[in-house]
């Protein structure tokens, strides 16, 4: 039996049933999975039992896994894998919901990751969902006067943005050198689908290039308020063994904090080498 792709909502997201990335997939199955990511933006491959090194190998089906910037979050024998936990090592085991504000991965880099793969290792009994926003749909729905204000603008993305509301891991000197400030277009075109999306990141955008803080903050706040509407969202309820893949070029996401923080939530994450947004 081959892999079956099933939509999970009308907004975005699908699940793939019947594939085992550990034992391998055929070229046609790989192409079907890749196309499902392009078509649905978020793809959940169910029932995957993958070690960190197997996760890296599976990730290579969709692109080139990249070594994670922050050394403290890497798995030693698989540096492409970072640990996303509600007990970050840098906090000495103190509970924390990481990434609970809307964002897209890696936008503080000149070539942000194309895809992120997140594998469920340990889940709370209930809650701990991940929510996603379809940024194609956001751009399409923007009122013409607001869309006209955004056309041609670029935003400055920083690892430590003055507007960031989330906990951010401290960088080493070497890591700071590897993550200088960058700027990206606020509307980008997806190289595979040819579609345009609103490319914003509340965690990392510091200001609109060439604008003063007051004017920049006002427009960004307006865009964020519009983008955060439930009509653009899909909420993923994790199951053991889920491998969720999303496209950072046309989505935002956040972790949900509606669960008992005494229960561990541990994920293994791989991001794929990116490209300059255009």
Question: Predicted regions: what is each one?
Answer:
Residues 1-243, 249-278:
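Non-heme Fe(II) oxygenase catalytic core, chiefly the N-lobe of the double-stranded beta-helix
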